[in-house]
Amino acid sequence: MKDTFVEKVDDFVKQHDVLKEHSTIVVGVSGGPDSLALLYYLLEKRAAKQFEIVVAHVDHMFRGDESHEDLQFVQDLCKGLGVICETIRINVSQYQQQYGMNAQVAARECRYAFLERIMKKYDARYVALGHHGDDQVETILMRLVRGSTPKGYAGIAVKRPFHNGYLIRPLLGVTKEEIVDYCNKLKIIPRIDPSNKKEVYTRNRLRKYVLPHLKEENPQVHEKFQKFSMQMQEDEAYLQELAFEKMNKVITKKSDKQISLSIPAFESMSMPLQRRGIQLILNYLYEYKIPSSLSSIHIDKVIEFFKRTQPSGSLDFPGDLKIVRAYEECSFGFKQEIVSPFLQDLSVPGTITLSNGDKLVTEVSEDIPSDMNETVFVAKYNDISYPLRIRSRENGDRMSIQGMNGTKKIKAIFIEAKVPREKREEWPVVCDASGNVIWLPLLKRSAFAISKETAKKDKYMIIHYKSKESSGRIMK
């Protein structure tokens, strides 16, 4: 007769395509009943499935000698079982203080970094963790109570990408009670973490006071929550694809540290896609290392920020992320140091690279470019005094405007073009050797410029503005 626990896990693993044969699996083992049940299950399948098993254990050093004894327990167990064991002691409290995060997040980051390292070392395809069905119920309830993103409400994923393989949770189809029964049957005596009973933690209170009532209503409640989780994940994957597609049409500029979007185009999207669109931007900029202090409230703040009647403003997010609105455009980017005034000579022909990576390239030609757009400036060579100088703006700057009488303040040009204030200090101002402002790239040409219509055969000085920024596609 088949063991009920093993049979249920087998069915779950097969249903969700969790494991492939001939694989190396790193098993996270704390010494508690959940991870030990997972280890013994995989060992039972090792010969038939041709698995290679590596155990990984992290001592977070939260409980002094007691947590060190957990490490020794796992080492001794693996020695007796003939299983490779990799362990590490990490002062998580120190890491927590250094990076300003709560203890649970700090422990998770340290643990996952170690698991990734062991995965690389053994070229493993999977990292297996012992989360079970009751954990799934508690997680979903906790996120509903605290608030989360739609992806968060889906709970714990059965299988997700991790390093060059997958992080898997084969025990999500069984309950804690079934795990304890399996351990008792095999006469496994696990280590017990006393913090799992402390009611200071929300999860422990839900486990003690809420979960028993749910199980009274339906003993298989974990299966219902798991089904809910899978449906949420499937729906979320579809909506994420839609949001990704829409956002690539909304984004106007993108670099490694900054993304800009059109607010009217963004607001034309449905609200579910708006929320996911903001999440995509945050994932990209934070490189999927979202600060623990960031929550769904912040996404709602961005959406409310767009609805304000004021044409400009800013929001400060964790990790020095700043969101700046300027009229109908909004930029998400990390705070930069104050831009110092700059001055550079530009030879003709020649090239200079600006602080933002963009370039100004000059040439001399008897022919003018076929495309005379805002990235090109053309003047008669002999009308300009050399060398050209590229500098930051100065108080009182004015320039003559092509096709207009008199001069105009550069400040007024920036305001009319709705250039954000923080961008104005780094905007290049092109002057001749006499100090005349001859071009404000992308914005205005001076009276020194010639148009395509008035151009005749002559010797011309041409300046090209070349941006390094890619178009606005968000990397997946």
Swiss-Prot record:
GO terms for biological process: tRNA modification. Keywords: ATP-binding, Cytoplasm, Ligase, Nucleotide-binding, tRNA processing. The keyword Repressor does not apply. Pfam families: ATP_bind_3 (PF01171), TilS (PF09179), TilS_C (PF11734). One of its GO terms (cellular component) is cytoplasm. Coiled coil: none annotated. Gene3D superfamilies: 3.30.465.60, HUPs. Its main location: cytoplasm. It comes from the Bacteria. It catalyses: cytidine(34) in tRNA(Ile2) + L-lysine + ATP = lysidine(34) in tRNA(Ile2) + AMP + diphosphate + H(+). This is tRNA(Ile)-lysidine synthase. It comes from Bacillus cereus (strain ZK / E33L). The lineage of its organism: Bacteria, Bacillati, Bacillota, Bacilli, Bacillales.
